[in-house]
């Protein structure tokens, strides 16, 4: 039997090859497709965030080793993707893992939708309030978490935007 790399090269993935022949494996391999998507999506969201802040006049420096963004030499952000997990109970939850070794000022947790194919919402989590290694989010969270939730990144962009001040008379 050929190695899985042959199937991946020919069909895109072993799961896709299974689907083409109508085979349903005993194990759920959807997480492999999700991981593949996340590897493509993460650089896109970092680039979009970096570009948008720069378009507003903000100065963005990205650490190439960690992807930590330093904004206007004032604060740093780390973007993390939180995949949707649905156990047998049917209740969706998300695990947000903080990169405690890098200690960014703000962790931007991008919570993915139920298909793990698009951003659902964003949590702007300051290190001062969330210094632990991670948190668990549900579909509905306590006000302590919900107060950090946003439908888009406009609040972050507002923090990074540079505004010219008129000269005083």
Predicted segment positions?
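Functional cation/ligand-contacting sites centered on basic and imidazole/sulfhydryl donors
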Residues: 1-169
